[in-house]
Structure formats: C-alpha cells, structure tokens
Swiss-Prot record:
<dbReference type="InterPro" id="IPR026058">
    <property type="entry name" value="LIPIN"/>
</dbReference>
<feature type="modified residue" description="Phosphoserine">
    <location>
        <position position="260"/>
    </location>
</feature>
<keyword id="KW-0805">Transcription regulation</keyword>
<dbReference type="GO" id="GO:0005635">
    <property type="term" value="C:nuclear envelope"/>
</dbReference>
<dbReference type="GO" id="GO:0006642">
    <property type="term" value="P:triglyceride mobilization"/>
</dbReference>
<feature type="modified residue" description="Phosphoserine">
    <location>
        <position position="601"/>
    </location>
</feature>
<feature type="cross-link" description="Glycyl lysine isopeptide (Lys-Gly) (interchain with G-Cter in SUMO)">
    <location>
        <position position="565"/>
    </location>
</feature>
<dbReference type="GO" id="GO:0032869">
    <property type="term" value="P:cellular response to insulin stimulus"/>
</dbReference>
<dbReference type="GO" id="GO:0009062">
    <property type="term" value="P:fatty acid catabolic process"/>
</dbReference>
<dbReference type="GO" id="GO:0046473">
    <property type="term" value="P:phosphatidic acid metabolic process"/>
</dbReference>
<feature type="compositionally biased region" description="Basic and acidic residues">
    <location>
        <begin position="162"/>
        <end position="172"/>
    </location>
</feature>
<dbReference type="GO" id="GO:0031642">
    <property type="term" value="P:negative regulation of myelination"/>
</dbReference>
<keyword id="KW-0539">Nucleus</keyword>
<keyword id="KW-0832">Ubl conjugation</keyword>
<feature type="modified residue" description="Phosphoserine">
    <location>
        <position position="438"/>
    </location>
</feature>
<feature type="compositionally biased region" description="Low complexity">
    <location>
        <begin position="441"/>
        <end position="456"/>
    </location>
</feature>
<comment type="similarity">
    <text>Belongs to the lipin family.</text>
</comment>
Amino acid sequence: MNYVGQLAGQVFVTVKELYKGLNPATLSGCIDIIVIRQPNGNLQCSPFHVRFGKMGVLRSREKVVDIEINGESVDLHMKLGDNGEAFFVQETDNDQEVIPMHLATSPILSEGASRMECQLKRGSVDRMRGLDPSTPAQVIAPSETPSSSSVVKKRRKRRRKSQLDSLKRDDNMNTSEDEDMFPIEMSSDEAMELLESSRTLPNDIPPFQDDIPEENLSLAVIYPQSASYPNSDREWSPTPSPSGSRPSTPKSDSELVSKSTERTGQKNPEMLWLWGELPQAAKSSSPHKMKESSPLSSRKICDKSHFQAIHSESSDTFSDQSPTLVGGALLDQNKPQTEMQFVNEEDLETLGAAAPLLPMIEELKPPSASVVQTANKTDSPSRKRDKRSRHLGADGVYLDDLTDMDPEVAALYFPKNGDPSGLAKHASDNGARSANQSPQSVGSSGVDSGVESTSDGLRDLPSIAISLCGGLSDHREITKDAFLEQAVSYQQFVDNPAIIDDPNLVVKIGSKYYNWTTAAPLLLAMQAFQKPLPKATVESIMRDKMPKKGGRWWFSWRGRNTTIKEESKPEQCLAGKAHSTGEQPPQLSLATRVKHESSSSDEERAAAKPSNAGHLPLLPNVSYKKTLRLTSEQLKSLKLKNGPNDVVFSVTTQYQGTCRCEGTIYLWNWDDKVIISDIDGTITRSDTLGHILPTLGKDWTHQGIAKLYHKVSQNGYKFLYCSARAIGMADMTRGYLHWVNERGTVLPQGPLLLSPSSLFSALHREVIEKKPEKFKVQCLTDIKNLFFPNTEPFYAAFGNRPADVYSYKQVGVSLNRIFTVNPKGELVQEHAKTNISSYVRLCEVVDHVFPLLKRSHSSDFPCSDTFSNFTFWREPLPPFENQDIHSASA
C-alpha cells in the first residue's frame, strides 16, 4: 500500500507540474529560427515566432522584448503585441507602399528617450496652458455624491489606487497596483460601462450644454474603437483602456473570455495566426451583416469639430451640437468641483491642431489618472467605477452593482428582447467598427492587436482647419500665429459659405497648408474612403493646383541641400503612429510639431528640423510596420556561428521580474541537405499518448530511431523537426527531444518548427481533424525558399500519416525517400509499400540510403577524394605508349 501511495503521489505531482506548464496564464513559447547563408554571402531567415503568456507580460516595461544570443545582448529589440506576440519594427520610406492596418505600428524607443519625450511634451503643454504640472487631470461629475464616493472607496482594495503626483508617475512608469489578476466574464452592464467610458460618455453631455457659451464649445469628437477584438484562437480581449495609453493584457493560449453576441452585433470570428504572419482576425462568414452597419450610413460631420463623429441611431439624446470631452477635461482648482471644464478650440489650436487630440490631452493628466466621470440623473456602475489598469482588461462583475442599480438605469443596460432601441441595436451599429486602437502614446502598442476593420483609416485622418491668412503665393512663410489670427470659425463659414472662393483661403490638413483647389480632392478622399491620398498623388495635385513661386530659384536649391544634410544624420523617431500612405504622422510630440510647420509645395519634401531636445523628428515619408524577419545586415550584426546558437527573448515585468523565452537560431548553408522528421507518431509511438506519457516519465519512443538519426547526421545531413503542435508547447517538445536517449545515443540537434496558433486550435487540428498538412505545407515551403538557388534542399522525410506524405511531396521530397511508420514500429517506404522494414533495419544500411556527403569546405579530410580507401589501395594504371598508334596511321 505504501508503494501504491507513493506512486499515486508521484503521478499527482507530475500532473500538477504538467498543468503548471500548460497554465494559460504562463504559457509562452518560441519557435526555432533557421538562417541560411546564400552563395553571395547574404543571409535569409525564417520568421521569429515568439509568444509570451499573460502572466509573463503583465505590466511589462514599455512592451519591449530584449534579445540575447549566446549569452550576449544584441542591439535589436522586439515589440510586444496585444496577443502576446513579439515582432520587429521595420522602417519604410516607400511612398507607394500601402501598409495594412494590422501591420502598422509605432517605433520602439528606449526608456530614456521615451521618458525625455514625455517630459518635453508635458513641459510644453504646461507652459502653454499655464498649469501646474502636479495638478491632477481628472474631472469630478456633479452627480458624484458622498454615497457614490463611498462606493468607490469601498472598491479600492481590489482595484488600482491612482496616485496624484504626476511628476512621480513620469519618473516611475510602473505604477503600484493592487487588483484582480484574472478577468471574469463580463455581463452586459460591464460591457456597456467600458463601451461608454471609452467613448467618453457622449450621452451625458447635454445636461451641461446650456450652461456653457456656444462659442467656447468647439471640441473635437473622438470615438476610440471600443468594441472588443480577438486575441488568439477562439478568445476575445476586453475593451481597450479608455485612456488609450496602453492596450489591454495579452490573452494567452486556451483562455476563453466570452462576450455577448448582442454587444458585437455579429458572431465573433476566430483569430488566425498562420506561419510567417502576425495574428489577425478571420474574415466574417456573414458579410451582409457588415453592410448593414456600413460606416457611410451612420457617419455625420460634427459641428464645431475637425473630426468625423460616428452617431448611433438609437442615441436620441445625442445631437450634432453636443460637444464631447477629448480624453479628459481639466479641473480648475479655483472653481467648484461640480463644474465641468471643456477644452475650447483656441486651446486646441495652441496645442498644435494635431489630428488625434486624445494623446495631447493625455499628456495633461497622469498616465493612470481616474477615468472622467460625467453627470447623469442617477448613479450607475459605469459612472462610479474607477478606470482599471492599463494592462488588465475586463474587470469582474460585482453584485452590489446589480442590487443597488436603479430600475430605470437597469432598463438601459438590460433591455427586453426585441427592443429595437436596446443595447443590441446600439452595438450592431458600431459592430462593424470593431478594431484595434491606434497607439496613443510613445511606445504603446495599441495598434498591435492584429485586427483589420472597415474603419482602419478613419482614426488616422488628420485635423482640418481653414483660415484667410493667405500667403501661399507670396514670398513669406505661413506661421501658426498668422494662421490663427485669420482662422475661420464654424459660424463664419455658415454665414458666408463663399469663403471657399476667397483667394486668401488656406486649408490646413494636419500640419500642411493648401489652397482650396488642392485641398478639395484630399478632403473628398477622407470623407468618401476614410483614408488620405497617397503622397505621390498629393504631390501631383500640388504641382498642378498650387501657385508657383517664381523668382525664388535659390529656395528650392536651399531646400534640397537642407534635405540632403538632414537625411545624412542618423534617424531617431520620437513618437507617432506609422502612416502607410506617407502622410505626416499626426501624433508627433508637441515641440516637434511646432518646429516643422511647412507651408509650400517646395517645402513639402524637406525634412523636419531637429528639436531642442536633441532628437530628430519623424520624417513625413517614413512609416513603420511590423515584421517577423530580419534583413541580411541585421542578421550579420547578430554574429551567429555555424550550427546552433542559443537565443533568449526576455520581457521585464514589475512583479515577475524578467520573463524569459528560450529558443535556438541555426545557421546553415544554402547547399545543406535536410532530413524532415515529424514528432507525434514518428518519434513517439502514437499521437495522443505521445503528448502525455513522456511527460509522466514513460518512454514512448520508437526503438532504434535515435541511433538511425544519429548515424544519418554523422553523414552530413541536417535534421529539421516539424510538428503541428502549438507554439505554447515549444519548451515541452524541445525538452522531450533532448530527453530521448537510447543507450547513450541521443537525437541530433535541429530546429523545432511548430504552429504559431493557440494550444486548443493546434490540438484540434492535429489530433481531432488529423489535418496537420495545413500548417506543414506552408511552413516547409517557406523554409524551402530560403535555400534558393538550391531548389531541392529536403533529401528525405519521416512521418506517420498520409497527410505527412502529402506535405512532403508538396515541398519536393522524392517519393522513394519518404518513410512512414505505424504504431507497431513498421517502417514503409512510399514507393515500395510492400517492403516493410523498421528503424533498426534501416540503420544497418544507412550508408546506402543516406550516403556520405563530401564537400571540400565541410569534410573532415581536406582531400577526401584523393586519400580515400579506394584511391589509396587501388593498383596504378599501366603506362600507355602511343608511338605504335602514330606509326600505324602513317
């Protein structure tokens, strides 16, 4: 009985450790990378598939992934996306290249640079606004009574305690937080709360509209994308943080957070993470639903606004005249807390009139300040709740919210079935706009969720303003002050629409100045297609429509020299979201934006001047996109050695310290011969038990396979292990391959290629559907292309299913060198299926099936062809005299 008890205890401990390894909160993995040296010396690599689990990236430092190769740090860094995936940021200056929205991102900045940039922006805003930097930027709603304050105070034990010292926040970006570690399923009231808070609660504005002069209300209406988006297969992320400063916590494999289908208005598509690509949402199976909520049917131009406002048809209290708070409002200490303060148009123009005003207002408040609370007749959970952490997603649903809720408020959040004005219709109108949020601050990765949307270009549109300052055809440059002095207000334009015919009219789009003839097609493209025109098209229109500046032949020469001089300096990006069309990024820092206000067609292509902080601003034609591959120069900088190179990807976190993800980079030559080997059912005896029994310590390996693979590798062949397992099982699978030991003989080293998809998706595809060829064909084809000009790098392959045979045939493996094995250990050669063998028998004739590869630069003997057994012991040829031949012919 003691023996049985010890055995049961050992099994329990083993299963417990296995569960910890598969825990969705800690599941991370890295797929090995293959680097191929080309004949000309260039290097090509397979994609860097790295994924961190949720606990590993909780409150990470700037979402930057550090890389160590062979124990030494390298200068390259990766960035962390919302799905936990790591990717490189590639700079591109191609005007014609259109970057998809799910691939657009912001540059990676060092901690010191981003901190300096934050201080620079805050200092500039404080000087212009005349505010104390330590003033907390939060608004207290008039409806906040002592009872609501007590409720908020009661919840602070399980929620983040916001600090009031903004200077201390900027010095220490990692705030102390005490909150729930895992999200709970959201109910509709919680979803509505986050939906409304991210939209800055437009329905609560009308009660204050009568108290504020209309001429002071010229607010930009910004609607951040508030609907949820997928993170990994069959999972959905919480709504983005209202502040937009950081995206929510990356979900991990096998975690499922359900959302209401009424809130999204359509069935949630799954996330697809294919080989060599970044995760992105699968296309909807019902496209007609998307058409019902087309952005063209519900979009209006908001009065007093430079932005397009998206109105819900069910919101009867929201009108065109309703101003909306942008990110938050400022609290004047000299006025009662019950008075709501707004940001007027004059202040916004002073701040630079950049396109997304949300990040500018964000700089006026601490990064983790409480969410803006607005007034309403009754208190609701969405009004009393503090803003959650920037990293954590959906909060739990608390019972006191349901019991204390007013019946009228409950009717708003829990509509009856069939109510056309309920939450379902409200969400369906905006369901088509479900997308990832744009990065709202330096180093943020809000755009990194990998979700495409019908409104990708909507939030990228720059600000628009008009003025009668003139100067486009004169010899003077348009300044900000001159533009603001003659700025045209909304009321002036209503009274006199013929202003567009005034020759002094100047249209400011983003940071550029145009006449009306040039600006008209630009504005039409923004309104009709929600995306700006490409830079090449804009330049063509400007050449035809913009007035020529005659008599200034020296100016273009000076601008050309200035451009060359500035482009020769090392580029260092400060802030901003990458624009695929090459337009001026609207989210540059405030100081940088003031520096490079260009006004003429001759100055359009001139680079921006450096700011006083010593940084070079983002060039107008430079954009940034995600990539999983490195260039040849970047690969050479890694200083890889031939064969395996240990690589460690690490993310610094506040609570867990440093989360590390280990892998291997293999440097091979273009003429190497590769042997492909499956794992489940090929090295192990069966598929399902091959996942479980080795973890419990049971040897479930085919007999003789380790010796066979070892002898084949000694003949000069490289091994590649390809399995349809998920990336989260990389460490477990890699450990199993190292654990296999057959009387002192181990498996040869080789790259481990796994599916980048989630755990359950990969298990379902391989074990249930039994269709691993979906992944294998795509993966092996990509690896094959790295060996070009060698079109047949794969010499032989081992598998256990007809699907494996199909995959190997697709990548050019010869049929007579494809071997399949069954659970009994019977090895079959595909071109002669009646000839049944085994790993042990094949090992006896390994030199005939896998002959020794002889190459002058890799052989043990430099002259192996001269000093081999045959050439050394053979009899010399007898001398041959050709004199008789010449005499006979004569």
